[in-house]
A protein has these predicted regions:
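Binuclear metal-dependent hydrolase catalytic cores
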Residues: 1-176, 181-184
Length: 184
C-alpha cells in the first residue's frame, strides 16, 4: 500500500544554470545559495522505489550533493541537452548490479538518446562499469512501483515535450512539468 512520496528538487535553474557564465548581474554575482541553481531535475522516493526525472549535465553533482546511491528508474521529459547530458553518469547505478536500469521516454526522445549515446544501446557490454539500460518507450500511462505515471503533453517552443502527473490510484500526488511554453 502506498504511504508517501518524498520529492527532492535536484535543480530548478534555467537551461544554462544559475549563475550564468560571464554574467555579472545581481543574481549571478550573488553569494546567496538560493542563486546557485543547477539544471532541472527531481528525485522521487517512496518505500518501494527511487527514481529521477531528467539527468542534465549537473546530474553527477546533484547525486553527490544529495547522496543518491540507488535508482530504480529514470524518466525523461524531452531530449534537450539540459535534460539528458548526464545520461552516461547513470552507469554508477548499474556498475555493481547485473540488472538494467529502466529508462522511460517518448519515442523521439529515446531515438535521440540512442543517437547521442550509441555505445550504451548497442547491446555490447564492454567492461564491468558499463551502463546497462532497459529502454521503455512511453506510449501512455505506466507504473513505477506503486506510483502511477501519466505523461502530459506540453508545448515548449517548437518542441513537444512531456511533463508527468504522479498518482496513487485515484489520488493525484503531484505533477512535474519543467519546461513549458503553455499548458492547456
Amino acid at each position: 500500500m502506498f504511504n508517501r512520496a518524498e520529492i527532492t528538487f535536484l535543480g530548478t535553474g534555467t537551461s544554462i544554470g544559475v549563475p550564468v557564465i560571464g554574467c555579472d548581474c545581481e543574481v549571478c554575482a550573488s553569494d546567496d545559495p538560493k542563486n546557485q541553481r543547477l539544471r532541472s531535475s527531481i528525485l522521487v522516493k517512496t518505500h518501494e522505489v527511487t527514481f529521477v526525472v531528467d539527468t542534465g549535465p549537473d546530474f553527477r553533482q546533484q547525486c553527490l550533493r544529495e547522496g543518491i546511491c540507488d535508482l530504480n528508474a529514470v524518466l525523461y521529459t524531452h531530449s534537450h541537452s539540459d535534460h539528458v547530458m548526464g545520461f552516461d553518469d547513470l552507469r554508477r547505478f548499474t556498475v555493481f548490479e547485473d540488472e538494467q536500469i529502466p529508462i522511460y521516454a517518448e519515442s523521439e526522445t529515446m531515438e535521440r538518446l540512442k543517437a547521442s549515446f550509441p555505445y550504451i544501446f548497442d547491446g555490447e557490454i564492454r567492461y564491468r562499469g558499463y551502463l546497462k539500460v532497459d529502454p521503455q518507450v512511453i506510449e501512455g500511462d505506466f507504473k513505477i512501483g506503486e506510483i502511477d505515471v501519466t505523461p502530459l503533453p506540453v508545448t515548449h517552443g517548437k518542441v513537444e515535450t512531456i511533463g508527468f502527473l504522479f498518482s496513487s490510484g485515484v489520488e493525484r500526488l503531484f505533477a512535474y512539468i519543467p519546461d513549458a511554453k503553455e499548458l492547456s
